[in-house]
Curated annotation (Swiss-Prot):
EC number in record: 2.4.1.69, 2.4.1.344
CDD domains: Fut1_Fut2_like
Encoding gene, per UniProt annotation: FUT1
Keywords for this protein: Glycoprotein, Glycosyltransferase, Golgi apparatus, Lipid metabolism, Membrane, Signal-anchor, Transferase, Transmembrane, Transmembrane helix
Keyword Nucleotide-binding in annotation: no
Name of this chain's protein: Galactoside alpha-(1,2)-fucosyltransferase 1
Example of a GO MF term: alpha-(1,2)-fucosyltransferase activity
Keyword Cell cycle among UniProt keywords: no
Transmembrane region(s): 9-25
Length: 366
């Protein structure tokens, strides 16, 4: 049994240790919040993390020998916390992701995505931006900025350290200088790429049975656009004449191409696209709730025919090669042209074919 004086000394020592530990944790937590970090998990082993969480690795954190990939780290020169509100469908959120990444880098800020965007994109792509935990999102003193769909000078000098972007940006003018990084972010998971390539390998040209030498992805946007374009935007969707002209453009320039058609209106495609030459394959499943299968097919092709919409844009951007797009698809007085600049939407080297606006002529009459 220790003397009473020794027991008092031990108790005092333990009390000092406990108070020191509590003080350290309080200051550590306050510092992390002050710098915009939601530290749900500290590495080393990222595989133990179940998204959505905000992950940030402290400098010099040792890595587990079994770690399959490094924890996402922001350069020390970056500060603040930026994110973007996930809105719209698959292609919209790809545009929001790419724009957030590019603008945050340009302004020296850390970029985080919200859980809904992670849920939409992570099952398809090897994206690397960390996810902001909901509790961090809710207590962050955000400034908000709605983006228009083209790069502007003011976007290169945004001073807010805690910024939540919104809107539907999908213009190459935001991120084309980072094209290889963007393409890397949107790398398909292996099983999706392999499944798409397996479908393409099985395709044969109808008349000869030969393997095609060139794959041209064709995305035909229909669905809600059939009403939205004429009724709201004084615009049209692609018709069969446009698709025929676009396919002929590729037939004149590439030997033995095969056209891999995907759409959210596959029945219309089968009824209106001429497949008599044996080089048109209706390969899409048209499931809007699970668009990644069609997207993977398009992204694995060599070239692209797109109609309208961000889904087709991203398929073309990732596929590379030649792209033909539907041009001038609204009347000149369309309100759509206030939020959409064709020169900022389509890469300069892409080839536009004018839409048939005759169905809209009654709308143009005084």
């Amino acid at each position: 049994m220790w003397p009473r004086s020794h027991r008092h000394l031990c108790l005092a020592f333990l009390l000092v240790c406990v108070l020191s530990a509590i003080s350290f944790l309080i200051h550590f937590h306050q510092d992390s919040i002050r710098h915009g970090l939601g530290l749900s998990v500290l590495c080393p082993d990222r595989r133990l993390v179940t998204p959505p969480v905000a992950i940030f690795c402290l400098p010099g954190t040792p890595m587990s020998p079994n770690t399959s990939s490094p924890c996402p780290q922001h350069p020390a020169s970056l500060s603040g916390t930026w994110t973007i509100y996930p809105d719209g469908r698959f292609g919209n959120q790809m545009g929001q992701y790419a724009t957030l990444l590019a603008l945050a880098q340009l302004n020296g800020r850390r970029a985080f995505i919200l859980p809904a965007m992670h849920a939409a994109l992570a099952p398809v792509f090897r994206i690397t931006l960390p996810v902001l935990a909901p509790e961090v999102d809710s207590r962050t003193p955000w400034q908000e900025l709605r983006l228009h769909d083209w790069m502007s000078e003011e976007y290169a000098d945004l001073g807010d350290p805690f910024l939540k972007l919104s809107g539907f940006p999908c213009s190459w003018t935001f991120f084309h200088h980072l094209r290889e990084q963007i393409r890397s972010e949107f790398t398909l998971h292996d099983h999706l790429r392999e499944e798409a390539q397996s479908v393409l390998r099985r395709l044969r040209l109808g008349r000869s049975g030969a393997r095609p030498r060139t794959f041209v992805g064709v995305h035909v946007r229909r669905g809600d656009y059939l009403q939205v374009m004429p009724q709201r935007w004084k615009g049209v969707v692609a018709n069969s004449a446009y698709l025929r002209e676009a396919m002929d453009w590729f037939r004149a320039r590439h030997e033995a191409p095969v056209f891999v058609v995907t759409s959210n209106g596959m029945e219309w495609c089968r009824e209106n696209i001429d497949a008599s030459k044996g080089d048109v394959m209706f390969a899409g499943d048209g499931q809007e709730a699970s668009p990644w299968k069609d997207f993977a097919l398009l992204a694995q092709c060599n070239h692209t025919i797109m109609t309208i919409g961000t889904f087709g844009f991203w398929a073309a951007y990732l596929a590379g090669g030649d792209t033909v797009y539907l041009a001038n698809f609204t009347l000149p007085d369309s309100e759509f042209l206030k939020i959409f600049k064709p020169e900022a939407a389509f890469l300069p080297e892409w080839v536009g074919i004018n839409a048939d606006l005759s169905p809209l002529w009654p709308l143009a009459e005084p």
